[in-house]
Structures are given as C-alpha cells and as structure tokens.
From Swiss-Prot:
This is Photosystem I P700 chlorophyll a apoprotein A1. Keywords: 4Fe-4S, Chlorophyll, Chloroplast, Chromophore, Electron transport, Iron, Iron-sulfur, Magnesium, Membrane, Metal-binding, Oxidoreductase, Photosynthesis, Photosystem I, Plastid, Thylakoid, Transmembrane, Transmembrane helix, Transport. It comes from Sorghum bicolor. The gene is psaA. Phylloquinone binds at residue 692. It is a multi-pass membrane protein. One of its GO terms (cellular component) is chloroplast thylakoid membrane.
Amino acid sequence: MIIRPSEPEVKIAVDRDPVKTSFEEWARPGHFSRTIAKGPDTTTWIWNLHADAHDFDSHTGDLEEISRKVFSAHFGQLSIIFLWLSGMYFHGARFSNYEAWLSDPTHIGPSAQVVWPIVGQEILNGDVGGGFRGIQITSGFFQIWRASGITSELQLYCTAIGALIFASLMLFAGWFHYHKAAPKLAWFQDVESMLNHHLAGLLGLGSLSWAGHQIHVSLPINQFLDAGVDPKEIPLPHEFILNRDLLAQLYPSFAEGATPFFTLNWSKYAEFLSFRGGLDPITGGLWLSDIAHHHLAIAILFLIAGHMYRTNWGIGHGLKDILEAHKGPFTGQGHKGLYEILTTSWHAQLSLNLAMLGSTTIVVAHHMYSMPPYPYLATDYGTQLSLFTHHMWIGGFLIVGAAAHAAIFMVRDYDPTTRYNDLLDRVLRHRDAIISHLNWVCIFLGFHSFGLYIHNDTMSALGRPQDMFSDTAIQLQPIFAQWIQNIHAGAPGVTAPGATTSTSLTWGGGELVAVGGKVALLPIPLGTADFLVHHIHAFTIHVTVLILLKGVLFARSSRLIPDKANLGFRFPCDGPGRGGTCQVSAWDHVFLGLFWMYNSISVVIFHFSWKMQSDVWGTISDQGIVTHITGGNFAQSSITINGWLRDFLWAQASQVIQSYGSSLSAYGLFFLGAHFVWAFSLMFLFSGRGYWQELIESIVWAHNKLKVAPATQPRALSIIQGRAVGVTHYLLGGIATTWAFFLARIIAVG
C-alpha cells in the first residue's frame, strides 16, 4: 500500500447541459447512423436499425459519450425493473388470494391472476383452495412477501405505488445525467471511488437496512404468523418500529436497548440474531433470525470493504498497484496493463461482470432448494422447480453474454501493439494448446459419458440387467461427491464446533423436515445414476466452453483468416473467392455456443426435476412413511437413454398432453405452440439465403403484375440475420416447451 499526500484541488466531475433535450430525433429512425438515417431502400434497413440502435460503439468513437449513453440507459433499465416490480405487487394487491394464503399456506395455493371470461377461458381459473379460483403462480412472491412481514393487500398496494414513484425517479435520473449534468470520463474511470461507494453503499448499507427491517419488522410479524395469530390482529410494521415494548414482549433483550452492544455482551442478542442452522420445522425455510444475523454480518464486512480503497486522503489500496504487483513465477508481466483495459473497454468490464454474475446466478439456483430461504417455499414444489429452472437459464445466458462481450472487446478494443507478455498476451500465444486440449477433453467426456448409457441400453435390450452399470449390478458410486456430503454432514461439532446442524439437510445426517404432511427437504442420496448424468453435465459444459473460448481466443486472427480483426465482430464469410471461410466470426461462435448452453441447461433441469420428484418431494403419512411423487424410480430408470425417454419425458408429459378441458389447458396450448415456434426456427437454420431470394423475386413479380409493388425493395435476410432469427426461435420455443411441460406436471402432481 502506498500513502501519498492528499491533493487539495477540487475535481469537477460533471459537464453542465452537454446535450440539448429535443424530440426531433425520435421522428428520425436511425438518427445515430448516416446510412440508416437516409431511410429504407430495401427491407434490410429495418434489420440494421434494430441491430445497431444500441450499439453505441458504432454511433461514436468518443468513450466519454459512449459511457454517458450506457449510464443513462442503466437508469432506464432500473425504471423498467421498478415498473415490473410494481406490476407484481399490484397483482398481489388487486387480484390475489394473498391474505387467504397467509392464513393457511399449506392447503391454499398462491394465485395472483384471474382470467376474465371473454371467450370461455375462465376454465383456466382452477381451484387453488380456500374457495379462490385463479391461475396458480410459481414465482415465489407470496413467500418473499411473508418473509418481509407483509400482512395485508393494502400494504402490497402501497408498495406498488412506491415502486411506480421510484420508476419515474429513475426515468428522470436517466434524462438528468445525460442532458443536464453528465459525468466526465474521469468519473466513470475512478474505480477506487466506485468500489468504495458500491461496496459500502449498495452492499453494505443495503444489507444493513435489510437486516434492520428483518429484526424490527419481519421477525416479530413472522413470530405472530407462526403462532397462528390472525394477520388482521398483528400490529402494523410501524408500530414495532416506534414502540420498543411491543418487541420486548417477543424478545425480552430488546428492553435493554444498545447497552449489551457497547458493553460487548453481544450474546444477549442471540434471540433474534441466531446461529441455529437447518430449517424452521414450522415453515420449512431457513430460520429468519439466522437470515437477519447473516445480513448484519455481511453488512459489516462490506462496510469495512468499502473503506479500503484510496480516494481523496492518500491512504488505502490503489487498484492499479494491486494488479501490477500481481505476478507469478511463470506469468511474465502478470496483470500489468489489465487496469488500462478495464478502465477503457466497457466490453472487457462487462464480460468479467457477466461471467461472475452468471456463475453466481447458477449458485443461487442450487441454494434455493438446498437452503430454502423463505417460509413455505420448500413445500411449494411448483415454485421450487420454477425458481431452479429460471435461475439456471438466466445464468446460462449471462455466461454466453460474457463470451460475446469478451470477443467484442478482442475485436474492437484490444490493442496488440501495447500488450506484451502480460497474462492476456500469454494466453493468446498458447491458444492452440488450450483449444486442442479442450477439444480432446470434450471428445473423451462425450464418448465415455455417452458410452456408459449406450452400454446400459444395450445390456437392458439384451435382457442382461446383471451386466449394467447400476446400484444393484456394476456400481459406479460417486465417491468424491459422497465424501463431500459426509464432510459437510459431519462438520457440526467437528470442524465447525459452534454450529448445531450442517449448512444444508441435503448433505445427509439430519432428519427429514415435513410441513403439513409434505416433504420440505431430506438428505439427498447420490448413486450410479447421478454419476452417469454428472458426466453428461461435464461433457456439455466443456463443449460450451470450447465453442465460446475458441470464439474469444480466435476473434482477431487465426491460421485460416490472419486478418480477422479487420472483418469485425460479425461477418458471414471472408469475401467471395475464399471458400471454407464462412461461420468463423466471433458472432458465429456466440451463435453456436447458445445451442450448447441450451443443451447443458436442459440436462441440468431435467436431472433436477426427476431427481427431486423421485428422491425428495412427496408426502409423509402419520406413521412417518414417505411416498415420493415418482416412487424413487430415478436410480434404476435414468441409467439408460430409453429410461429418460420413457419414464421421464413420456411418462411425465401425460399431464400436459392430457390438460385439455382442465384448468391446466393453457399449458397444453403453450406446449403445442412452443413446439411450433421451435420447429419454425429450423426453417431459418436449414436453408440458405439464395433460396429465399429466388422465392422473393417471383413474389415481387406477382406484385408488379398487380401493380401493388412496394417502394421498399424486399430482400432475403442476410446469413447473420437468418441465424439470429433461427437461434432466437430455437431457444424461445425450447424454453417455453420445457416450461409448459414442467408446470403442467408439477401443478398436477405436486
């Protein structure tokens, strides 16, 4: 750490009134580009307009102007998020059975949408219990509202109005910080200040205020709810905040105020800042007092972290110094130059952030079921399945986005003349070794993982079960995974002496938790079936990485096309006369990577859905006998490809296929429609541009004959446009098909 004398001069961080506010440009589509602004000659114009509208790099080369546009757009994005949240809360306030659900969450399903009977579609309003008819929702909003201490639909209504006010504030901020007081480039590049404010402000004070809300509002209200008090009789949130005696009745140590804090007698607060571990047996969720404790601890860590970086007072860490000192014995210049890259290329910055956020989102997906954070979430199987699936898809898309922006950085922002022997340069210089090894790994994993299934299918077909890989014949137990499970299950009292239970019941060792006769969570057994499918996961993930990483490492040049950087991020081929150079652009790698990301995530969510129905979710009788939804058939059925097709896809599709005439029939229609959207994509992916151009010419001829030809000349989609439309419909169709299949199934049986 270097300590320099503080600099007294005042820095001016904004420009006043840099851009006049005017609506004239709104009337000129494509005002950001000279070519597009001329208006359409051919139908390609509308595609270029959409492709380039948000590509700020192509509007100007001025980094300050680009930064301001991105910054302003972020406020617009936040405004949309607040608007969306407001809509969710408004539905809860106006169209939901939230108050009824609150009084009996085990027998009443959450619903916040009632279909109007216009053409007879009121059939979709199923009976969710308690005499309420509506569409069952699986977003988890009811559970999070209960955890926050919301007890009435009026409170939801007020929150919805509050979110609308914030949405308009964000819109105003977006306009203000572009037209009235726009930050200078130096402000965007002041990473130490940004770190301090984001760490201490957003994460530190954000967590602290949430911890405060949980202690003063959520905990007491949930205490009353758990005890069966009618929500209408529970004091309102502000009463707990203003009247300490109310809290002291529930938590006696509240009467002592801040004295235990200053006398370091902190254990007095253990009533509401607990360290219990495990799940609350009443709600099947994590203990809310544990969650409050967690947020308080996190807040303190981030508040400290937000004071570590050097800004005005010449004390603290400088990011540039940290990065440049980061050298290993075998890494040449190490991270030298990374600081310059990350403060001048927003694509490089975004790429890192997307990779981190995508990975975090996938980690969240796995924690939502193994450590269910909200009351009555674990027994709402539809919501559990939806939350896992949703976070897996989002994580997958974010990680592909990370590769996309890394490649854009390589093409547009990377300057090879200034980079020598730093980590990035060294990776680029041995990219052939990286990609060829990765390729070998993919071939190995593909043949071996798939080979195990093919072996099992063959033995099963020949009637030789004793020669199959299974828990009852040739065992391939996942011993490393079981070892990790055992370490965690045995941690309390050994490696974590302060803990009373392990972090998650899924590790094993504990008793199952059931709420209202339904299983919330139990130790998850792993066997040969999991070993097989985990190697399919390894295979699909490595292929996705191979495609995406090859796109990044060969974005600027390759043996095939040494001057690739000059062709840009997306191009169809290296010009006429160079055969075999199509589909090599960085964009095409993102395109291909999306398909393999879709493969990867599909296998994960199928594995999760079947495993949970087979080994976790189910009912428990008065005698303590657990009956799982599919009766534990995962271990013996999922070890063949035929088993996946027969006992998972086909057997569990019966609910969506037979949904017509019931309240689930919308899922049946979606299942059909989404298959159609998916099939529609193949038309774009399997045919060439010339085919369509020929067809268009004869259609134009017919229009000319009838004198109804348009002034704008119709053109076939370019190769890139066709692939973009194709992959979009492929993913949209595939994801919506899966959604309909999952939800119809789990709402019917869960």
